[in-house]
Amino acid sequence: MLYIPRMGRPPLILVSPSIEKSGVEFHDLSASLSVRYDSAVLAAGGLPLTAPATTDRAALAECVRRADGVLLTGGDDINPELYENSFPKKILKTVEQTPDGGERDERELVLIEEIFRQRKPLLAICRGHQMLNVAFGGRLVADIRQQVPGALNHQRLDRPEDLVHEAALTPGSLLSKICKAQVLGVNSTHHQAVVRPAEPFVATARSRDGIVEAMELRPELAGKLPFLLSVQFHPERLVQKHARYRAIFQRFVEACARNKIKKS
C-alpha cells in the first residue's frame, strides 16, 4: 500500500547511484541503482531522483538545493586512502573500488558537505553509512574477516532479504523510536564497517561483535540536520516483509516533507 504523507506534494529525494564499468546501452561507465531504493522511497510517499554522475561541485550543490532530502546508497568499497595511510597487501586485495577512478567517492564527499551546509534530511545506507563516517575523519575496517577477531559473518550476499543477525539499539535513540525496539534483526551484505564513529556521531546500534549497525548525530549536535539516520544494513530490502523497516523510510520522507514546506 502506498503511504501518503499529510503534507501536499511528495518531497523530492536525491538518490546517489552506484557506477558500473559496463552499462547495458554502450558498455561504458554507467549509473546503476537497485530499484529497491526507489520503491521504498515511493512507497513512503517520496519522489526519488537519481543524482547525476558528476563531480562538478556547483552542479551537485544545486541538486542538493532543489532536493528536500538525500539518500546515500550502497555499492562498491570506498578508496582506503581516504581513511587509512597503509594497509597490508592481503587486506587491500579484498577491496573492490568503484570503476570510475574514485569519482563516486569525490561526488559523495561533496554531497555530504552540501547536505550539512544546506541542512537537508539525510538517510545513509551501507556504503553511504561508511562514507558519512569517512567524510568526518572516521576510519573503517577494510575487511571484517581479517581485522575483527571472532566477527560474525557479515557478508551474507546469499540472504539479502533475511534477518541474519541482531543489533542492540541504544534506548531513546531515533532508530529505537522509529522501530519501537531495543533489539533489531538486520540483513548483512558487507565486508567493511564502521567500528568507531567520527566525532559528530554516536553509535546507536551494534552487532554483538562490535560492528556499528547504526549511527546518529550526538544529542548536543542533533540540531545540525532536520533528520539524520545512518545504517549499515539494507532496510530497502526488508520493507516488503517488515513494517518497522517501512517506518524508517516513512520517518525520513516525513522529515523531507517538512523541509519542503519550510523552504517554500
Residues covered by each model-derived region:
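A generic hydrophobic-helix recognition signal that picks specific residues
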Residues: 130, 183, 225-227
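Active-site loop->helix "elbow" adjoining a glycine-rich segment at hydrolase catalytic centers
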Residues: 127-129, 136
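Active-site glycine-centered loops adjacent to acidic/histidine catalytic or metal-binding residues
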Residues: 126, 190, 234
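Short secondary-structure junctions
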Residues: 183-184, 203
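Active-site-proximal beta-strand elements of phosphoester/diester hydrolases
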Residues: 229-233
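N-terminal beta1-alpha1 cap of cysteine-dependent amidohydrolase-like domains
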Residues: 1-121, 134-136, 141, 145-178, ...
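Short catalytic/ligand-gating loop segments at beta-alpha or beta-beta junctions
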Residues: 185-191, 215
